[in-house]
Amino acid sequence: DRDEIPTFQSVILASVYDIRNIRRKLRPDEEHRENSPWNIAADFLVDMSFSASEIGGMLKEYENDYHTGMDISMIAHLLYDYTSGYPYLVSRLCYFMDERLSDTDAFSDRKSTWTKKGVLAAVKMLLDENNPLLDSLTHKLNQFPELEKVISKLLFQGQTIAYDPDDVAVRNARMFGFVKVENSTVQIANRIFETRLYNRFLLNDVEQNNIIYAEGARQKNQFVINGYLNVKLILEKFVETFDYLYGDRAETFIEDEGRRFFMLFLKPIINGVGNCYVEPQTRNRERMDLVIDYNAQQYICELKIWHGNAYNERGEEQLSSYLDYFHLKKGYMLSFNFNKKKKIGVKEIRLGDKTLVEAVV
């Protein structure tokens, strides 16, 4: 007698590739691209990302085994802030902390590793490595130059990208999880991807030959004291350099390029030790809050286009509340002011229990 063995009647493939893209790999000819018997797949409407609470649950299990004394809620939310719950990125950061950072000169044991400083060190390792996911992100930008252009405008100018489901480049970027759609606009999917993209744009050969990048590199040694960034001095030197190089340029040039030029000036100063990114909820044509991660410390600098004193005061209040989120007492502002009577320079003001360093160029 034959044994009866149950067999599957159907197979579900859950993947970042939809069935049409698998078919393109097998049959790339253009004339049959959309009319194909392969177009039979149903949407797999399952959110594969982790929530902060789900990350916390995994950390709790780890803590039960290793007793690190970590602040589970804080670490879980920090991991989520950088990854938006992208499973591979969450796993990779935790791997770095568990396997690569613990028992090193910087982190003597697991207790010292599972801290905010340890998470930021793991983020730095992830951004510096080559892995298939981040390599694929770069490949997609090379494959779709138009996508690269619109993402550059999003990152540096705060330009809104309306979601168009017929845009092949954006559609593919969304399918691979590199971008997401919120309120019918395209956003970078998470902070890790965004920081990697900033590094790509700021460290390419063209930008490294930019004169303001060269000025940042030439002056970099004076900006770090005992491992800490002197952001006030960075702003002072940037104001001097920018005014000298571009002070007579047209308003539209400064509005479009000013914030990118500050990041270009900053990048050689922090490169190798730190990174920077923009909080997406603050990004628009008028302002964006730049977060600088440097040597496990964080600095917040609002980059904005000047629109009068009342707008400036609201910006100060917004920055003050944002500092509360990061548990910081000092913040920085850089305003690109088109008023001919403006006073160029840097000053400090007190706002409640916080100090704001304001630079005007």
Residue ranges: model-predicted function:
Residues 268-296:
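Active-site metal-binding core of divalent-cation-utilizing nuclease and nuclease-like domains
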Residues 131, 193-227:
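Short, amphipathic alpha-helical interaction segments positioned at domain boundaries
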Residues 44, 51-176, 182-183, 211-221:
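Winged-helix-like regulatory helical subdomains adjacent to P-loop NTPase cores
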Residues 262, 290-292, 296-307, 322:
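Conserved catalytic cores of phosphodiester-cleaving nucleases, focusing on short active-site segments
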Residues 1-34:
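Sensor-1/coupling segment of RecA-like P-loop NTPase cores
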Residues 26-48:
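A short helix-turn-beta junction within AAA+ P-loop NTPase domains corresponding to the substrate/partner-engaging
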Residues 312-316, 323-352:
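Nucleic-acid nuclease catalytic cores
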Residues 237-277:
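Acidic-basic catalytic patches of nuclease active cores, encompassing PD-(D/E)XK
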